Amino acid sequence: MEITSAISAILGAFGLSGAAGLNAWLPLLAVGAADRLGWIELGPSYGWLSSTPSLIVLAVIFVLDLIGDKIPALDSVLHAVGTFIAPASGAILFTAETSLSSHLPPAVAAILGAITAGSVHASRTVARPFVTGTTAGVGNPLVSTAEDGTSLVLTILALALPILAFVVVLVLMVALGWLTFRAIRWARGKRRTGTASP
């Protein structure tokens, strides 16, 4: 039973970290609120996530980020900042999720969380210019909304169905990897076209 609980916590942690790669603030807010409502139990070291000041700050930043990422002029700036925020969020979520049910060393948990969230965030950051260039910026709000929705679904699955959340993260990383490859090819083709133009 203890092994099953530990595996479940680790799989759920991957789900939360993947969600953080898409939206760094949403899973932090959701986990803090879930702990506050007694739906989940975080280790004593992560009780600050469910404190009133933390929930207020996370909620405000989440709303600002949610709006800002829909604006083409701001999304690139937010993605640049997210290069540091997303891995940090993933590290916190992974260690918080595994703190009670797993014997995974905190340092290892933090590294796994940071890598998972960072990889997802890096892929969407590389792919976003491709979306902007092929849709003249019109597709950015739609893609951003899809990312937020996926982050929410992943967060819920991570807390309720960890195994499914882990599978979704794997599929997501493959899909983002393919989109990143397409974005790089598009950027190279555009660069060659620009060089060849008189």
Q: Where on the chain are the PLM-derived regions?
A:
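Helix-coil boundary and interhelical linker segments in multi-pass alpha-helical membrane proteins
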Residues: M1-S8, A34-T52, L93-A109, A158-F166
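The first (N-terminal) embedded transmembrane alpha-helix
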Residues: A9-L11, S17-A34
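A cytosolic-side transmembrane-helix exit/cap motif
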Residues: S45-P53, T98-P106, T125-A136, I184-S197
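Cytoplasmic-side transmembrane-helix entry/capping segments in multi-pass membrane proteins
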Residues: D75-A88, A107-A110, T135, P141
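Small-residue-rich segments of transmembrane alpha-helices in multi-pass membrane proteins
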Residues: T83-T95, G139-V153
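Mid-bilayer segments of alpha-helical transmembrane spans in multi-pass integral membrane proteins
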Residues: A88-E97, P106-A127, G149
